[in-house]
Amino acid sequence: MSDISKASLPKAIFLMGPTASGKTALAIELRKILPVELISVDSALIYKGMDIGTAKPNAEELLAAPHRLLDIRDPSQAYSAADFRRDALAEMADITAAGRIPLLVGGTMLYFKALLEGLSPLPSADPEVRARIEQQAAEQGWESLHRQLQEVDPVAAARIHPNDPQRLSRALEVFFISGKTLTELTQTSGDALPYQVHQFAIAPASRELLHQRIEQRFHQMLASGFEAEVRALFARGDLHTDLPSIRCVGYRQMWSYLEGEISYDEMVYLGVCATRQLAKRQITWLRGWEGVHWLDSEKPEQARDEVLQVVGAIAG
């Protein structure tokens, strides 16, 4: 697309970053100054009743800056990148029609990628094929299925861990249904985002600072009643660790503690480690992201001013 045709598109802002980097605080500050409306881009914040462990904006913050796409699913329900793209595009169109600018804030990089580049035309899930894969896994083990994936799609196999049955079964399912590999199909993007996007990433300047923030926030969550929150989910009886909601960092470790698999101290240690690993993956995504403007979360006023400098011209 030419620069001239891009300039005629409606404007949007992406505010991305690893967990515990101060994205929400900056987004709320920007809403006070710019004509923006916030859309959450977070695969954990979509779930109702999962507030403390996801660091969901509190009532006061939401009053100051309402976020769209929060609390839109029960923890028992799935929500895909395709679901997000559909919902986000609808919200963006609504915001643009009102003469304001969508500000998309969060850390689920797959959602940002799906929104920006479109989605590949992957086949829908087939219960019969999935059942056949699970039967084979029960008989031969997931390691065997991972070797099978290596033979047909070595690129996907290198990316998917043998202990990740959900992604492993999906990669094989796609191949069995379509005759094409997941790698082949995902190289064909769908429709690009029909917006002129200003992209920002916020993170502390050093990894040590981010690690400190993550540890502090995890302990803060525990002090705020995180265990009671997960106990309420645990007591429902219909939730389990195969669900994306319960696999969220922190929740999975607390769940293991409630099931008696690990001690409280192990839960805290593993929860912090899992959150650090998530942050590392998010930063890896962002380092390979084209056209992103980096902000230092340790200098919030400077970060705010840099955003205003880049996008200030679109606020009028």
Swiss-Prot record:
Region spans: Interaction with substrate tRNA: 42-45, 166-170, 247-252, 280-287
Needed co-factor(s): Mg(2+)
GO BP terms in the entry: tRNA modification
Enzyme class, UniProt record, top EC level: transferase
Gene Ontology molecular-function annotations: ATP binding; tRNA dimethylallyltransferase activity
Binding-site positions, substrate: T19, A20, S21, G22, K23, T24
Top-rank lineage group of the source organism: Bacteria
Keyword Plastid listed: no
Reactions catalysed according to its record: adenosine(37) in tRNA + dimethylallyl diphosphate = N(6)-dimethylallyladenosine(37) in tRNA + diphosphate
Keyword ATP-binding: yes
Keyword vocabulary terms for this entry: ATP-binding, Magnesium, Nucleotide-binding, Transferase, tRNA processing
Site (Interaction with substrate tRNA): residue numbering on this chain: T108, R130
SUPFAM superfamilies: P-loop containing nucleoside triphosphate hydrolases
Annotated positions binding ATP: G17, P18, T19, A20, S21, G22, K23, T24
InterPro entries: Dimethylallyltransferase, IPT, P-loop_NTPase
Catalytic activity, EC: 2.5.1.75
Assembly: Monomer.
PANTHER family: TRNA DIMETHYLALLYLTRANSFERASE
Annotated family: Belongs to the IPP transferase family.
Function: Catalyzes the transfer of a dimethylallyl group onto the adenine at position 37 in tRNAs that read codons beginning with uridine, leading to the formation of N6-(dimethylallyl)adenosine (i(6)A).
HAMAP family: IPP_trans
Protein name: tRNA dimethylallyltransferase
Gene: miaA
